[in-house]
């Protein structure tokens, strides 16, 4: 189908009169008159050329009419993609090759392929049939309709046919849909037109940026502040306390082998210190009590070296050792009031020293 433009029509001309005039050269598909011009669609290209040749400047009702091919805006169907082009081929040579099939509006070579814009769709179809898979300058080129939506019209084009969303009325660079199919953010354009949005006020100490933030911002003051001397001393004491408990819990329990009934068990030392009882210190307390009972016998015995040597001599048939025979009598021990019988000396010195040395 070829569209013809008819200009300078007289007011007396009608559609039926124009249709009958062009049907002399071929089948007319459509005829429209708009004021003093009109359009005629002829099915055959040869018939359209004959009509242009014979009816151009034809006198109708005393007025010479103009008949020529319609120069409509090129559409996407007239854009051809030409692949596998020789590197020595130029735009003029490629244009001349396609002009054999019809008028060429634009021809652009990009590396080894090119885009050719033909004026009429019929000419583009004929060029595809005649030039596809043919030899041109030593290479077999491929010609087909272009499927690209970018610059469907020759030149810079207009705001129609956005190649991103397919809608009209805006440039492709201003399309609200980005390449991923999502609506683009127009924050930058808004800031350029109306100014940037004011940033929120600076938050004070302890405030959170988000309401109900489970984690919040890190408080460097609480983490890295210098702790007081009391806090450091308390931490060291707690650590030493735990160390003493672990050390004393491994000491074996000592069984008392002496008679300590002569000691005064009711004496109370107001300066005596005891650790708080816990699960790990039960065995330690029992061991310390047994050691204190054993040590008290040392301070309650006779200090005379002569009497002690005579009392400790072994009997016949017996070896050296300690037993009930080697001990002083309870009566002699009870009659003597030694300064060493005080309750504050009833504990083992070395055990207490190891116990409180960590402090």
From Swiss-Prot:
Zinc finger residue extent: CCHC-type: 160-177
An annotated GO cellular component: nuclear speck
Localization (cell): Nucleus; Nucleus, Nucleolus
Gene3D superfamilies tied to this protein: 3.30.70.330, Zinc finger, CCHC-type (4.10.60.10)
Region: Interaction with TNPO3, residue numbers: 196-359
RRM domain ranges (all copies): 2-72, 78-148
Keyword tags: Activator, Metal-binding, mRNA processing, mRNA splicing, Nucleus, Repeat, RNA-binding, Zinc, Zinc-finger
Gene Ontology annotations of biological process type: circadian regulation of gene expression; circadian rhythm; entrainment of circadian clock by photoperiod; mRNA processing; positive regulation of gene expression; regulation of translation; RNA splicing
GO molecular function annotations of the record: RNA binding; zinc ion binding
InterPro entries: Euk_RNA-bind_prot, Nucleotide-bd_a/b_plait_sf, RBD_domain_sf, RBM4_RRM1, RBM4_RRM2, RRM_dom, Znf_CCHC
Tissue specificity of this protein: Expressed in liver and kidney (at protein level). Ubiquitously expressed.
Keyword RNA-binding listed: yes
Statement: the UniProt record of this protein carries the keyword Zinc: yes
Subunit: Interacts with TNPO3, which may mediate nuclear import of the protein.
PANTHER family associated with the record: HETEROGENEOUS NUCLEAR RIBONUCLEOPROTEIN M-RELATED, OS02G0815200 PROTEIN
Job of this protein: Required for the translational activation of PER1 mRNA in response to circadian clock. Binds directly to the 3'-UTR of the PER1 mRNA.
Protein name (database record): RNA-binding protein 4B
